[in-house]
Amino acid sequence: MLVISNSEAGAPNQDPIRASLLNAGAYLIYDRLVEQDVDQAYHPHLAESWETSADGMTWTFKLRQGVRFHDGEPFNAATIVWWIGKYRGGVNDTLVDAIDHVETPDEYTARFVMKRAAPNLIYNLSSVFMGIPSPKSYDAAGDSYGVIEAIGTGPYKLESLAVGQETVLVANEDYTWGSDLSGNKGAPYIKRLTLREIPDASTAFLELKTGGVGMVIGVPDEFLPQLRAETNIGVKSLPGLGVTYLMFNSKSEPFSDITVRQATALAVDQGAILKSVFSGVGVEAHQFLISSLTESKVDPKFEIRYDIAKANELLDKAGWARGSDGVRAKDGKPLKVQLSTQSETAFRRTAEIVQAQLKALGMVAEIVTFDSTTIRDQFRKGEHQLAVSHYDWNNADILDWFYSAKNIPYPNSTMWNDPRSEELHDVAMLQSRTWDERVANFKKYQEYLLSQFVFVPLHEPVLNVAYNSTRLTLRDKFFPPFSIVDVSVVE
């Protein structure tokens, strides 16, 4: 039994085609054509090899033979034709929209004929949202697919899903086609795996310490000293793939005013949050993309950094006057906002630090705490003003996900819709012909978003994995969730 990262909490189903949120179970139920390693390199999986034409307009994949879905159906080129078609017009259509059609020269060759060059296609194909389900089972289940039944070719099968609580998986004993991301190419050693969602970090720590769970993925940094003091607990710290940030609702007053957004952003001290909430583990975030991406290397003048003097000056000039109680007001309206956060410990503590920092600006931020499912419902309804949020994603196209107008109201819960932003988005997403062009275009896109203060970057964490070292044996190279198949139980 293991506890999954809270960024995956509340996943409503295990349908990669129609979901906007999936938990780690989806990586284990489904395989993908290619897999991306922790070092960002790509490895063959259901595609044994692939070639791209010089102009980028055709991609040819040689498919692995002998693969079968959990329902016994064969995997072949016809599967790929059906699979790509299922994304059309759906929530994840952007993953395949550069593909015009799929040709099948033979039973185990699939050729993508492109509408345009799309250097990022290889990344898309490795996404958790591009796990390949069984056509037969998917079509038979209809809209209910992914809740009771989820049929892939992966090392685990879905036994049950209780949304917001746990996902139970059982080993696929017929599995013989593991990728290079795992040492074990066959059936998992752990035969029944429960992925639990425990939002409170203290509870998760106690469960690990007492043997209630065997592994916790995404351990808060402040627990590391306690964990390392336990003789029966091992810890692995891996490069993080996400950013914690503040989200503005740009359509909700007072954050519809760029001056208020800018002042709020400059009033937030990332260094204090790193020290107080994350015990100095990880790094400060000053832009939206993770620092390992080349696209994150923006001109430093666009980075969002703490400057309380300038923040106060901006509001003074904009007519937000301080009252005798220290709270600013303009046109009779006090500067009071709702600060939404999730119940998980790091989210709540971050909100409390931000609340105190905004008080120094003359802004009252009332903290309202939600569970992971309810807060997403609030985002979809546009009922939020300011929120502590987090994403895990290692590609610049996360900017499309959160800031493209087509994704309003969710996942673009910033409600950001701006002509110049859309223009830069389209150039980066649709007109980049080579990888270098794509990097340059995404830098420009992010620099514009930074200049509009549609978010406040806070912290870039590491991924801490703690496990019961007396019960579980892990490889030296451990990259969850792929490496779960390598974990063995000490008898």
Predicted segments with their positions:
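Gly/Pro-rich hinge or "lid" segments in bacterial periplasmic/extracellular proteins
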Residues: A41, S126-R192, S202, I308-E313, ...
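Surface-exposed binding/hinge segments that line
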Residues: K62, T94-Y138, G146-A150, P155-A162, ...
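Extracellular/periplasmic solute-recognition and catalytic clefts
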Residues: W83, T94, H101-T104, E159-V170, ...
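N-terminal lobe/hinge region of extracytoplasmic solute-binding protein
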Residues: S5-A54, T79, G85, I151
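Detector for C-terminal structural segments
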Residues: A162-E166, A267-V298, T345-Q355, R376-E491
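Structural transition elements
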Residues: Y156, N249, E284-S324, Q342-R349
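Ligand-site clamp/hinge motif
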Residues: V147, Y175-Q226, Q355, M363-E366, ...
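A structural "hinge/loop" feature
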Residues: S7-A26, L46-E48, E73, L121-M130, ...
